[in-house]
Amino acid sequence: MKKSVLIYLFALLPFTVGAQIKLNLNRNTPMQKLINAEMAINQLYVDTVDEKRLVEEAIRGMLGSLDPHSSYATKEEVKALQEPLNGNFEGIGVEYNMIEDTLLVIQPVVDGPSEKAGIMAGDRIVSVDGTPIAGVHMSKEEIMRRLRGPKGTKVRLGIRRQGFDEELQFRVTRDKIPVKSITATYMLRPGVGYIRIGNFGATTHEEFVKSLQKLQKLGMKSLVLDLQENGGGYMKAAVDVANEFLQRLDLIVYTDGRERSEFRAKGNGRFRVGSLIVLVDEYTASAAEIVTGAVQDQDRGLVVGRRTFGKGLVQRQITLPDTSMIRLTIAHYYTPAGRCIQKPYVKGKSEDYAMDMQNRLRRGELMNADSIHFADSLRYYTLRQHRTVYGGGGIMPDYFVPLDTTIYTRYHRALQARSVVLNANLRYVDDNRRELTEAYPTFDLFKQSFEIPKSVIDNIVEEGEKLDIKPQDKAEKKKTLDYMKLQLKALVARDLWGMDEYFAIMNESSPIVQAAIGLITNN
């Protein structure tokens, strides 16, 4: 507290060269040393100094010497970081993609301001308040700046719609737009529900309860909880979700720093009975690992997939006077069995820490469980069935599913990187939306009988050749195109219905999801 006050007071001091520095030099404290150095550089350095940048770099340097996750964010970065976790932002409410320098509406947010104003899927937004935004090479950031704004303010949108020659005008009143952290909820099989959580934000628990209730009404007895690629978020949200699975007073997680805190289940969870499988991969981190660790250590369910990221540090967000922020590690968290799952790091060597995923791939850990080794000192036991588990570097799943390296070929990655596949899908849906909705009035019919036309695939290949993107051989081409047909079918389903339908198609070929279904089916 004293240090933050000193920093704030220093910002208010007059910059009197000489006397002030001489006075401060007589005070021998680490904080005063830092202040003196900044004052000397700012007032005496031969060239003009950007003081704001100087201070920010000093803060980054201090935090970088602590651990890999203590960090500094400017006020602009703070807004971008917090938006997915806060649960809402203020704007017009559309899901969109950019195609050929034009904003194409994929879906208006249900009950959002754009839907209420009459904007439809497939519309192209070509102007905002009379200013053209299509065909003028305006940056995505600038377009978003024009579309977003405080709740209650109005914006006039120029729309190009198929079947109309003239530009249509819509007046939209901006409002709070929910940012969903649950990206899919549907029934995988009769009696088996599926929920995918993208991150743990302010509204995650509320969304999760609604998803549970929806699936339970559809007859769910078993649940597959997908935390793949979930990078974490708010610890409280993770604790609240874990509470839904556990019995009263079951330990969920505890933190240990300058103080120790325990978080236990309240006994009011909505899915305390029933088969539970948690899906994880190498990008499952932080808050997502709290849920995973609680389920595994309490023997509440099985963990399926690959070893998780290994982030066992708790950060506190501290807002600075200019609304920039530091995230400071204040504790380690531990799973119920006492495991700290933070992977090893050396202070000040963030580059080595960042190479962990490449090192796992190089060692074969993503393809073979036998390539993963834990020291005996990191051995722990689950609390009910006393199964062996390990700490010190992520959570090892109960059932390992290797990374399918045959899906993502070099050819496919190159096409994806240049947005060839995405743009082909957008053009196809845009040109055929009416015909598709008439031919496939229900998703079940679409899933059962729709196939991507060969002409779409041929166009992707031709577009790739124009960009000098070619397969190495016939085998790579066949493998890529087979997977691309599935991917495109899922993308069309997303554009016509939503993300539930997208995952309902993609998961039919997911090795991890299919492994989970097999475990539930075979008890």
Report the location of each language-model feature.
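Structural motif
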Residues: 122-124
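Polar, glycine-rich mid-to-C-terminal structural blocks
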Residues: 287, 299, 306, 310-377
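Cleft-lining beta-strand/loop regions that shape enzyme active-site pockets
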Residues: 19-30, 34, 38-51, 74, ...
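Conserved functional hotspot residues or short segments at active or partner-binding sites
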Residues: 340-341, 345-523
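PDZ/PDZ-like peptide-tail recognition elements
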Residues: 57, 69-107
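An acidic helix/loop motif centered on a single conserved Asp/Glu
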Residues: 49, 53-67
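Bacterial Sec-dependent N-terminal signal peptides
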Residues: 1-27
